[in-house]
Regions:
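Hydrophobic/aromatic beta-strand elements that line small-molecule binding cavities or substrate pockets
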Residues: 2-11, 33-34, 132-138, 159-165
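An acidic-aromatic
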Residues: 6-70, 155-157
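Short, hydrophobic/aromatic-rich segments at coil-to-beta transitions
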Residues: 14-23, 96-103, 119-122, 142-148
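Short solvent-exposed loop/turn micro-motifs enriched in small/polar/acidic residues
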Residues: 26-29, 84-86, 128-131
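A short, structured loop/turn motif at beta-sheet edges
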Residues: 90-100, 137-144, 166-168
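Short helix-loop boundary/capping segments
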Residues: 92-131
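Non-transmembrane domains of secretory- and envelope-associated proteins
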Residues: 121-133, 141-200
Length: 200
């Protein structure tokens, strides 16, 4: 499936987990709130029933925060991991004219996912091919990545970033609740309840 968002992403050094705060907005007018994270909570919405759910990550404690980081944060952490890790990896950088193609192959005993920092997933009760592959396409003109591909044995995902505008605001001016619709019922997120098409 294909999903399109307008994303406002802020580097957030105070957040030691993801390292970024962000909101996903609908592409029709760039105003409809879809999802948000502010370094402390993630905010999910169901427009059909006018409901907001807030997850402060305490109901179901995990060693990572279960959300997909925004594009540039994700790419930055892939590169940082490749430069700093002592894991078994193979990297290649191909000059493709107007862009570079970077490929990272992780040969560990378990798959590696990025929730901000890299996290070695626990082995499942059945065999899963553990190789993890990440690829980045990087513009030479501005040094920014514009495409990311993640390949696991069970799933392949691709994310493309276009029409980039450099954010001139600072993180101290970001409030995720400024983007949340007014008049919606607010509830605490329940991991045991059906999601009912909550945007994430």
């Amino acid at each position: 499936s294909i999903r399109k968002y307008i994303v406002k992403e802020f580097d957030d050094p105070a957040d030691s987990t993801i390292g970024a705060s962000f909101v996903n907005l609908g592409t029709d007018d760039g105003k409809e709130f879809q999802f948000g994270y502010n370094g402390e909570v993630r905010v999910l919405v169901n427009h059909a029933v006018k409901e907001i759910k807030i997850d402060n990550f305490t109901t179901r404690p995990l060693p990572f925060r279960p959300l997909t980081p925004p594009f540039f944060n994700y790419c930055k952490n892939i590169v940082r991991y490749a430069l700093e890790t002592e894991d078994s990896i193979v990297t290649t950088l191909e000059d493709c004219g107007d862009y570079f193609h970077f490929k990272l192959v992780i040969n560990e005993d378990t798959q590696v996912e990025f929730f901000g920092k890299a996290y070695h997933m626990p082995p499942p009760p059945f065999y899963v091919e553990p190789t993890s592959i990440y690829e980045l396409w990087i513009h030479k003109s501005n040094g920014l990545p514009y495409k990311k591909r993640r390949a696991m044995s069970h799933n392949i995902s691709v994310e493309t970033c276009c029409n980039v505008e450099i954010n001139k605001e600072t993180i101290d001016r970001f409030d995720v609740f400024d983007y949340v619709p007014q008049g919606y019922e607010t509830k605490k997120y329940d991991y045991g309840a059906p999601s009912r098409n909550m945007a994430a």
